[in-house]
Design a protein with these regions (language model features):
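N-terminal Rossmann-like NAD(P)+-binding domain of SDR-like oxidoreductases, especially those catalyzing
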Residues: 1-185, 239, 308, 317-323, ...
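C-terminal substrate-binding subdomain of Rossmann-fold SDR/epimerase-dehydratase oxidoreductases
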Residues: 25, 32, 37-40, 60, ...
C-alpha cells in the first residue's frame, strides 16, 4: 500500500508538533518546513525526530520559508504530499502591531505563495489553512461560520487575506482547500509569551519561590480556550471530507483572563490578586473584547467536539510548568 505523505508548515510550533505526532500515529510520512536559525528551534518535536538515514524513517524536515515561492514549488514537486497543512505564521497579536508588514508578508502573502506553489506544481492534494478567531474581531459572540469578520489587528487582517485566498483557490481552481477557524487553543507547548502560558509559567515560578509578580494587560478580555492536542485532530478530519469547506473549532465556553489567572493561582493554593499587576504596556491599540465560538457545524459534519474545558486545561498547564521548573538545574 502506498504511504500517505503530509506536508506541515510551522511543524516546530505548538500545533505543528501535535499534528506531526497525530499523523505519524496514523501511519503517514510527515514532511515539515523549518526555517534556518543559529540555534536549534525544534524542541517541541525532538522527541519524535528520526534520523533520515535510519530505515523506515517517516519524519523529514526541510529548510525553507513561506516567502520563498521557488523553494515551496520545488518541495511540492519533490514530496508530492496528499495533504498540506499551513500552520506557519507570525501568530502573536500584540507583536503584529510592532511588525505589521512582516506579519502580512508571512501570514497573508505567504499563504498565497504556498497555494500558488501547489497549483504550479500540478499535484493533487488537499490544503488546510489555519484561520483564527481573531478575524471576527469586534463581532459579538457567539461567532460561527456565517458571522461577520471585523479584524482588529494586523495579524487578524493578514489572516483574513489568507482565509479569502484559500476560498478563492477553492472556487477558481477547484482545489480542495479548507479553512479551519480555530478559537484560542492552549497546551504546555504554548509559546511562553501568550497570555495563558505566561500565567501558568508565572504561577509555577511563584509557587516555587522564583518570582514575585505577574504583569498583565486587559484582564476582562473573554476568550474561548481549548486544548491544542484535541484541536489538531479536527484539522485532519476536515481534509478527510469529500468536499472542502470552512469550519469553526471551539469549546463554546468563554472565560476572562482574570478567571483563567484565578483558577491557575488557586490550583497551587494562592490568590491571584496578591501577585497580578496591571501594566498598560500590554494593552493593545484595539482590543478584542469577546471571542466565543459555535462549533456546531464541525460537530455535525466532522463528528468533532471539544473534550477538555478551560479549567481543566489551566490546571494541566500549571502542573506541566511546575514539573518543568523543578527539572531545571538550579
Amino acid at each position: 500500500m502506498k504511504i500517505k505523505k503530509a506536508f506541515i508548515t510551522g511543524i516546530t510550533g505548538q500545533d505543528g508538533s501535535y499534528l506531526a505526532e497525530f499523523l505519524l500515529e496514523k501511519g503517514y510520512e510527515v514532511h515539515g518546513l523549518i526555517r534556518r536559525s543559529s540555534t536549534f528551534n525544534t524542541s517541541r518535536i525532538d522527541h519524535i525526530y528520526q534520523d533520515p538515514h535510519t530505515p523506515n524513517c517517516r519524519l523529514f524536515l526541510h529548510y525553507g520559508d513561506l516567502t520563498d515561492g521557488t523553494r515551496l514549488t520545488n518541495l511540492m514537486h519533490e514530496i508530492k504530499p496528499i495533504e498540506v497543512y499551513n500552520l506557519a505564521a507570525q501568530s502573536h497579536v500584540a507583536v503584529s502591531f510592532l511588525i505589521p508588514q512582516y506579519s502580512a508578508q508571512v501570514d497573508a502573502v505567504g499563504t498565497l505563495t504556498l497555494l500558488e506553489s501547489i497549483r504550479s506544481a500540478k499535484i493533487e492534494c488537499k490544503f488546510y489553512q489555519a484561520g483564527t478567531s481573531e478575524m471576527y474581531g469586534s463581532t459579538l459572540p457567539p461567532q460561527n461560520e456565517t458571522s461577520s469578520f471585523r479584524p482588529q489587528s494586523p495579524y487578524a487582517v493578514a489572516k483574513l487575506m489568507a482565509f479569502w485566498s484559500t476560498v478563492n483557490y477553492r472556487e477558481a481552481y477547484g482545489m480542495h482547500a479548507t479553512n479551519g477557524i480555530l478559537f484560542n487553543h492552549e497546551s504546555p507547548r504554548r509559546g511562553e509569551t501568550f497570555v495563558t502560558r505566561k500565567i501558568t509559567r508565572a504561577v509555577s515560578r511563584i509557587a516555587l519561590g522564583g518570582i514575585e509578580k505577574l504583569y498583565l494587560g486587559n484582564l476582562e478580555a473573554i476568550r474561548d480556550w481549548g486544548y491544542a492536542k484535541e484541536y489538531v485532530e479536527s484539522m485532519w478530519q476536515m481534509l478527510q471530507q469529500d468536499k472542502s469547506d470552512d469550519y469553526v473549532i471551539a469549546t463554546g465556553k468563554g472565560a476572562t483572563v482574570r478567571e483563567f489567572a484565578r483558577v491557575a493561582f488557586e490550583h497551587v493554593g494562592l490568590n491571584y490578586e496578591d501577585f497580578v499587576v496591571i501594566d498598560e504596556r500590554y494593552v493593545r491599540p484595539t482590543e478584542v473584547e469577546a471571542l466565543v465560538g459555535d462549533a456546531s457545524k464541525a460537530e455535525k459534519i466532522l463528528g468533532w467536539k471539544a473534550k477538555t474545558d478551560w479549567i481543566t486545561l489551566a490546571k494541566l498547564m500549571v502542573d506541566a510548568d511546575i514539573e518543568k521548573v523543578k527539572s531545571q538545574p538550579k
